[in-house]
Amino acid sequence: VGSEMCIRDRYYSAVKEKFRNLLTTIDFSKPVEQYVNSLLELFEGLCTYIPSSTSTKEVADISLFDHSKLTAAFAGCIYTYLKANGISDYKTELFKNSEKFYDKKAFMLYSLDISGIQKFIYTINIQGALKTLRARSFYLEIFMEHILDELLDKLELSRANIIYTGGGHCYLILANTDETKQTLDEFEKAVNGWLID
């Protein structure tokens, strides 16, 4: 156990030092929107294999990165929801009246799906099928990432709000507000219109 503690301490010290050094590469004088995703990527690279819980009585199956990313996403959604509903006394709303807040539908799980165009992937000739299949799959993945980044930009959110993306699907956690719903509706119409043209 003593040697495990020593290895763990050295590992965490190395991660902390690397984190400190990498933070110097980010220009914090710019608006937060310009560096938040870089910060998120840096955090993912360093904290994916660090458990969020240090308790030896718990199974360490959730990474510090995933825990922190989801916490940031939910915190951002709560802030947006409260702001949209004209609530500025956060302490009262979230701590003193927490039971009431838990009953509110402050969050929305949003799914984006482009897998309906799978026919595009699989209508290929036998000659060079594998190469064509890979290229079309890659194209759809890049297309999904582009759509996702555009949507996040319109919603003024970071990639922290992405719960899952892959295989032509993605899931986002969003604030359940009229403004969010309107933005989603406008975005869906624009993307569908672009795809039809």
Language-model region placement:
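Regulatory and interdomain segments flanking nucleotide-handling catalytic cores
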Residues: 1-4, 8-197
